[in-house]
Amino acid sequence: NKERKNLSLNKPTFASSTTYGQPSDATDGKKDTRWAAAKAENEWIYVDLGSVQPVGGVRLDWEASFGKGYKIQVSDDAKTWKEVYKTDEGRGGVDEITFPEVDARYVRMFGIELGWWFGYSLWSFDVLGGTQPSEGLSDVHFIRLTLKDKSGKIVSENNYWRGNDRLDFTALNTLPKAELK
């Protein structure tokens, strides 16, 4: 399993309120800094990734004051938000959340129910990159190409190997048949 890139590292970060630290303390990559919100539900923190990017999850490292209920939302403009994850069973500690990959510039944790006496508090708010393959082949792929003549006899068989990710190439079977002479 490939480690996903932390897209939020040192990116501009904003919050509805702050009672401890700064919002940027949740995205600075340090283990000894944190952000905490006012003691209220409906508090939030969001990060600006700088451009629209594929996002496939978040990692929330809660301090003792965690979110029992919260949503993860994404946006292209920081005004209109789309929910990609919601829970009312948060237990604190580290929540590593994955969701179907979505393109977004802004990612927000929106608290809806406090899990402790104080406001939401995060050691880190990591936005995890998606798993979309980059241009060309990724680290490992295996493709087997077989060419057959009209009678079904194999005339060429080639194997190509490269990469670490498994991909489904069955769509190659839907390509039009090539005419060989």
State where each predicted segment sits.
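Carbohydrate-binding surfaces of carbohydrate-active enzymes
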Residues: N1-N6, G129-L180
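Short beta-strand-plus-loop segments that form exposed binding edges in beta-rich domains
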Residues: F110-W117
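Short edge beta-strand segments in beta-sheet-rich domains
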Residues: V94, Y120-L122, V140
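Short, conserved beta-strand segments of beta-strand-rich sandwich/propeller modules, principally
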Residues: G57, Y106-R108, V140-R144
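Disordered, acidic Ser/Thr/Pro-rich linker "stalks" and the adjacent N-terminal cap
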Residues: N1-V55, D61-Y70, D76, T80, ...
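Short, flexible loop/turn segments at beta-strand junctions in immunoglobulin-like
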Residues: T98-E101, S134
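Short tyrosine-centred short linear motifs in exposed loops/low-complexity segments
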Residues: Q53, D103, L137-D139
